[in-house]
Amino acid sequence: MTGTYTTNELERIARAVRFDTVAAIGHLGVGHIGGCMSIVELLTVLYFDAMNVDPADPKMEGRDRFICSKGHAGPTVYATLSRRGYFDRGLLWTLNVGGTRLPSHCDMLRTPGIDMSTGSLGQGFSCAVGAAIGSQWAKDGATIYTLVGDGESQEGQIWEAAMLAGNHHLGNLIAFTDRNRYQLDGDVEDVNGLEPLADKWRAFNWNVIEVADGNDISEVRAAVREAQALRESGKPTMILLRTVKGKGVSYAEKLGAANHNANFPPEETVKALNEVAGFDCVTEEDVRTAHFPDLLERRVE
């Protein structure tokens, strides 16, 4: 899959993913808007440039896997999967309603393309380590990708799994930290500081790649390719992404820690969607009725 799309094409896809994520959360009226916005570029690069997956066969043997350990960012995962062709875009407007296939947190029993149920912080990362060990045993050539939040990185389970991954020389494991610096209770460094974070990962026998702008497609793409090239190093790789919580949505960016799980009223949703689109294309009635334009003329296959 690597190299199929130009940077400009990936940026266009990312804009559509961001728009659809905002639309889904806005139609519901509440959600983890901040932590969803900060990872849009990463997921776009993974699913449209890096990962060996087949939407027509979500359980394909030897496929790469992505486990979103910060499971509250499920809406962005869903928007990305929809754009990649796993299911119809209209399903996004059923986010977290009764009987939906798209609960607020990732659920492998409900949603095509989800490889692990997550939400209890720290557990998804541990499962990714286990999946990487299993892939090594199976010799299937797969790469396991996983994403943790920086607030989540205060969980002891993260570091137990990190130690195991380093000791088992999991070169087939690439992890990301969404370093947006905010958690539910405030600034991560004020609540329970992580720095020097890169040194900590190196001490656990991991390669570390630091990305100055984790919301820049080119920088994220380059980091992922660098990590892929380190597969034979015998070490897992952690990519630290410095991101902006709520990226691309002024309302969400200003909320800081308050946007961990925030109300998203129709009037703010309209502003946000028009801001992301770059032109006026949505009304409050559209938000209520889930009548949202498609920023891409066609689904990207």
How does the language model describe each region?
Residues 297-301:
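Non-catalytic terminal/interface segments that mediate subunit docking, oligomerization
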Residues 86, 90-108:
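Conserved AdoMet
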Residues 45-49, 83-84, 133, 164:
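Active-site catalytic microenvironments for nucleophilic, acid-base chemistry
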Residues 2-74:
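N-terminal amphipathic, basic-rich helices that act as targeting or association modules
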Residues 53-59, 63-65, 105-296:
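Glycine-rich ThDP/TPP pyrophosphate-binding loop and its adjacent helix/strand module
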Residues 44, 79-82, 93:
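Generic alpha-helical structural context detector
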Residues 75-87:
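Alpha-helical support elements that line or immediately flank enzyme active sites
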